[in-house]
Amino acid sequence: VSIVSKVCAYTNHTILAEALEKWPIGFLEKAVPQLMPIIRELDNRVRAKVSDESTYIIKDGLVHMAHMDIHYGYSVNGVAYLHTEILKNSELNNFYKLYPEKFNNKTNGITFRRWLMSCNPELSAMITDLIGDGWKKDANELEKLGNFVNDDAVLDRLLAVKAGKKADLKNYLKMKQGFDIDENSIYDIQVKRLHEYKRQQMNALYVIHKYFEIKEGKKPATPITVFFGAKAAPAYIIAKDIIHLILCLQQIINNDPEVSPYLKVFMVENYNVTMAEKMIPACDISEQISLASKEASGTGNMKFMLNGALTLGTMDGANVEIAELVGNENIFTFGEDSHPVIDRYARGDYNSRSYYEKDSELKRAVDFIVSDTVKSVGCSENLERLYNELLNKDWFMTFPDFEDYIATREKAYAAYTDRKDWAKKALINIEKAGYFSPDRTIEEYNQDIWKL
């Protein structure tokens, strides 16, 4: 135990209960019988010194792996500032009271070699032309791009690079999946694991809202292409129902001659790293719309930022740090922050139907899920199950944020029409992305935890 406690450190990557391993004692006694006496002894030592039952390793017939990590590791860290604060003040508060000295933050990073140099050589070349190639070894040198935010020639070149990547994605998806994409449209992209907390369902409800607006004659100033890319866990039924809805919307909207010149929806097949390398450099608006308090950090938000996309997001995960870095005028934030969300969960009084009844735009969008129009191209069972889930549960609180989401998304689309100012915002995002270098992350881990 003495050796383990000096060697092992715990990094928490999620607060979702489903991802914090808890193994039935009976299963472990069959699978690893040689380990159970050790686990019981570790638990007994905790019980001898701690009175708070919620922190015990063996509880309710389950072995709580995270509890073991915290008691016997020498460090506990979250992976974004907000995430770590939530661990300390909410999710792991009982442990924080026991071991405040163990808790620290290490904000995630992304590899620039993959997510800029490899996937966007045109932007990499532009950056090198402007500030030299020192940024490839020291990402903080991207700050030098701040000298060019008012340089029209640089902004024009940045727009040209983005236009080229948008054309590349258009051609790639035409070849691979037969999609007919308007490269002059706004590329609004949400690509990530399909999970209710990431709220692809809220994005889909906005698409329905926009569909109705266009049908009523309210056409956007710039055409919009909404891209989804995601996979659902094999047994995650509601996630698959959300994919089903998106595919229904793709079929309805893209084949409607009144709507498709102004709005199209594409769910890319088999979303993976190869696809991400095509989509991220082409993105104009990066959808990072998780329910505040649920995304530990996120790294897609960093990849999009690095490639000059603007974030449309909640104040969750690393979005909080992105907003601090780029300034409120260079990011589009909306929705409740983590405090009212955590309080509402604690009270257990969230009623999605009350929001549905008082917001006519929300009600119309939700009802469309089970309309004859959607059922004519989809499966009633999937659609009704999703409809009932939203109306009677909506565990990740899509409805409270919906009105602000619409308003902020419209604000982002309006900002896009000023191309020079948009390019300035994009360049500022690239300039500030150096903080999310993995070199900085790893250096902090080494200084504070590993001490190699």
Predicted regions and their residues:
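A conserved ligand/cofactor-binding region detector
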Residues: 1-452
